[in-house]
Amino acid sequence: AYTIFHYGVSAWGGYLAIGLPVAYFAYRYDAPFRVSTALYPVVGADGLDGVLARGVDTAAVIATIGGVATGLGFIATQLLAGITFETGRAFGNAETVLAITGITTFFTVSLIAGVSKGIRRVSQFNIGLMTLLWLVALLGGPTLLLLNTGVAALGTYGGNFLDMSLFTGASGGASWSVAWTVFYWSWWIAWAPFVGLFLARISRGRTI
């Protein structure tokens, strides 16, 4: 349930908080594709080139760098941890840096290729790979247990969403909340400018 909670509606709510206003004002009022465009009703068209808007865009860039750096670190360490689990070979900092460099190079090439040729194809490949892994795990593992656990987790998540969202650990367990929920939400907030702009960019022709 907490996995769904940490990666589910709460995370996408942050992305949409930026993506929706940017998409609306960019396509309806011909505003630029910047995070500061969400401030269009407050600062107006002329204010998008002002100090406040520039400050918001600068903060968005810094947050994006932090979010991407954290994601790359997690991906690299999880990849190497999986290899260690299968082979028993341990990896150090040098291998982690090499893995991060390789992943960064791969995604940089996909970005340079553009949305239709690069990112779209990588996304389609990821969806196919995810579907394959899901089918292998579902059909090759304890199928009924996985289905029952998934349904139960959705029920727990739906029934306790408010409690989970507002839990601060005031009477105990604060360290867990900080290490998990607060950490993940901070991570998603850092990703929000990047993902929000991406959603805005691909939303042309779609209604809110």
Spans of model-derived segments:
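Membrane-interface interhelical loops and short amphipathic "cap" helices
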Residues: 1, 75-91, 145-178
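Transmembrane-helix bundle segments that line or gate the permeation/cavity pathway
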Residues: 1-85, 109, 138-149
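Hydrophobic alpha-helical transmembrane segments
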Residues: 2-20, 56, 96-101, 168-192
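Hydrophobic cores of alpha-helical transmembrane segments in multi-pass integral membrane proteins
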Residues: 9-24, 66-70, 126-137, 184-199, ...
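Hydrophobic, small-residue-rich membrane helices and short re-entrant helix-turn-helix hairpins
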Residues: 34-51, 111-130, 150, 195-208
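Glycine- and acidic
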Residues: 60-68, 115-117, 177-181
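Transmembrane alpha-helical segments of multi-pass small-molecule transport proteins
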Residues: 89-115, 132, 185-197
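Acidic, glycine-rich loop-and-beta core segments that form the ion-binding/anion-interacting portion
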Residues: 114-168
